[in-house]
Amino acid sequence: MTLTQEFDTIAAISTPLGEGAIAIVRLSGTDALKIAQSVYKGKNLAQVASHTINYGHIFEEERLVDEVMVSVMRAPKTFTREDIVEINTHGGIAVTQEILQLLLRNGARLAEPGEFTKRAFLNGRIDLAQAESVMDLIRAKTDKAANIAVKQLDGSLSKMINNIRQEILESLAQVEVNIDYPEYDDVETMTSQMLLEKTAHFEQLLENLLSTAKRGKILREGLKTAIIGRPNVGKSSLLNQLLREEKAIVTDIAGTTRDVITEFANIGGVPLELVDTAGIRETDDLVEAIGIERSKKALAEADLVLLVLDASLELTDKDLELLELSKNANRIVLLNKTDLPEKLDINQISGDFIRISALKNENLSAVEEKINQIFFAGEIEAKDATVLSNARHISLVEEALKALKEANNGLALGLPVDLIQVDVTRCWQLLGEITGEAAPDELITQLFSQFCLGK
């Protein structure tokens, strides 16, 4: 059982700054109740039951600051495993800042970014992977990304990593006993063949986990998607339909989009970072020319390319150039303006295409299905599956897998078991960095500094 560490009492505004119905000022620490009581008039907070909400007022000496509801949660059954007080105020900037300053003047310290979650980690309530999933849940752009984050917050990834580490540790312990106590008969001798079988098993477990990384990373970070095409083929209309709001100017004047517009859209649970590029054409307009160069750069960096062609016109040389330019990309060719008579010769297009009308919002569901087919083999999210999505976790699993492969290569070359133990131990340590069991203090500090204030 992890013992709660002794810390000072911290305070921060936990809701976004700005105007709203309510805001929350949070306290955590040994003196949380005492400091809150020093500015609160209502029930005696030291005597109220845990996990209750209490009506009262905040005063600065005799001056009324706000009418509030105060939540009291006593250690250890709290997020930080410390006493927590949350003051629910009216959601104005001035009043929340004033209440925070009152708490700071009465003994609290302003929390650092992510310090509440850091205390939850240091006090043993969550591990490092779960702590990171808190931020992933906050930043999730779709329901499926949120589902992955909440499963990791619930400990699914941590449980899998801990189970693998435990198996590795048992093998390492057996090697150690064989080395240190060769005369001990009650422990089976770990031969090179036995260790090879075990490391091959661990390798398979990590490869299975790593196979989920592509799907997880896409759902967490999104697909960088470039919408390309000649001017006035309907790129901005498509962007507006995918976003379900007007973000781009739509006219029949070529060159209206003179730069790169970037927005996020939720397409069937997949976050698309949509880049509406300036129409690629020859132009003497300097500003538009710069936009076109950026469009070409966006095309080169894109995970997915949506090439829009005007089906109501014959293909131009520029259309054919774009078809050639994007042929090696993950590309979906969209024949737009199907609400008009079709003049485009489909025999000039190699590969699949989808007919749509961005203006009429027709057949865009087929685009969603095609994206799922390209990136997820038709299945976006396997139910109850543990998915790797965090870039740090993916990198550590890759390094751990590399260490196992080096161990296997050494065993194949006939190296002694005690030398192979070094690589297997490194694998075990790398996996421990995911959960925080073996993470250096500098890494922990750096990770929590990326959190928002009040979390």
Swiss-Prot record:
Keywords (A to Z) from UniProt: Cytoplasm, GTP-binding, Hydrolase, Magnesium, Metal-binding, Nucleotide-binding, Potassium, tRNA processing
Single biological process term from Gene Ontology: tRNA methylation
Subcellular location: Cytoplasm
Cross-referenced Pfam families: MMR_HSR1, MnmE_helical, TrmE_N
Entry-linked Gene3D superfamilies: P-loop containing nucleotide triphosphate hydrolases, Probable tRNA modification gtpase trme, domain 1, tRNA modification GTPase MnmE domain 2
UniProt binding sites for K(+): 232, 251, 253, 256
Cofactor(s) this protein cannot do without: K(+)
Source species, domain of life: Bacteria
Positions that bind Mg(2+): 236, 257
Family: Belongs to the TRAFAC class TrmE-Era-EngA-EngB-Septin-like GTPase superfamily. TrmE GTPase family.
Known function: Exhibits a very high intrinsic GTPase hydrolysis rate. Involved in the addition of a carboxymethylaminomethyl (cmnm) group at the wobble position (U34) of certain tRNAs, forming tRNA-cmnm(5)s(2)U34.
Name by which UniProt lists this protein: tRNA modification GTPase MnmE
Gene: mnmE
